[in-house]
Amino acid sequence: MSKGHSLQDPYLNTLRKEKVPVSIYLVNGIKLQGSIESFDQFVVLLKNTVSQMVYKHAISTVVPARPVRLPSPTDSEHGDSEPGNA
């Protein structure tokens, strides 16, 4: 995994696994809503009443409907550390 994906992939994966509703804002200002069904290096599959394949280069912002906590590398060892308090 490249350096550029060290935050993106765990963030999207947490949103996917926890089925967190998200608003995705595109670079042209359009707002899409749904939950992340899947993603890869280039696209995000957003599920609402239908599934939409959204190219990552068109995404400006991903806004979760509720706060999410990203797993940190030390979580698997300690389980109680807060992100940013390493």
From Swiss-Prot:
Species annotation: Pseudomonas putida (strain ATCC 47054 / DSM 6125 / CFBP 8728 / NCIMB 11950 / KT2440)
UniProt-listed Pfam families: Hfq
GO cellular component, one term: cytosol
Annotated Sm domain residues: 9-68
Family listed: Belongs to the Hfq family.
Region feature (Disordered): 66-86
Molecular-function GO term, any one: RNA binding
Keywords, ordered alphabetically: RNA-binding, Stress response
Compositionally skewed regions (Basic and acidic residues) per UniProt: 75-86
Protein name, UniProt field: RNA-binding protein Hfq
Subunit composition and interactions: Homohexamer.
Cited InterPro entries: Hfq, LSM_dom_sf, Sm
